[in-house]
Amino acid sequence: DCSDAAMKHNMASEGGYNRRYRFLKNIMGMWMIQSVKKESGTTLSYAQICDKASHTSIDSTVDCYDERFLAPESMIDEIAKACEESGQQIPADLYETANVVYKSLAKCYASTIAEIEELTGEHYTCINIVGGGSNAEYLNRLTAQYTGRTVYAGPSEATAIGNLAVQMISSGEFANEAAVRRCIFDSYGVNKYE
């Protein structure tokens, strides 16, 4: 879609296998939580941070599209400032900060899906999350909650698996994309959130 409306919403078309194109919007994704983890110096895993964030009650969110989060001197401070400037609760620790990030991303996903549906005239009943974000159980639950859609999360190594899948189709191991997708779904522990 090369319309003015698509450009206004910062949408893109990404080329893929077999001359297919995906209409999409690049979202900050896990960059914010990676920055928070690194800056905090914690030795906890992303899964542990995600779990601990899910047990906090802060409801603050920030705009993940805001350029202030692209490369701030301190991601933790920038998130706190954004919360303060908007009159919301300021996160008090790593876990509240992570909760703000996860809730903000889920809200961002919901608004992006609404934009895509508006531009395409299509309604999507499910969301597929792949890559590292698919391991963030709390984020996936929030995404299902905020979007009202079923979320399928995984596989986490989607790029490598996708490259292998294309080679297997080309060599005749699979008849088509549908067959390889079914195999991936059955083989890699895709989790479902509703």
Predicted feature residues:
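Active-site core segments that coordinate phosphate-bearing ligands/cofactors
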Residues: 1-126, 135-159, 165-192
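Glycine-rich Rossmann-fold phosphate-binding loop(s) that bind the pyrophosphate
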Residues: 132
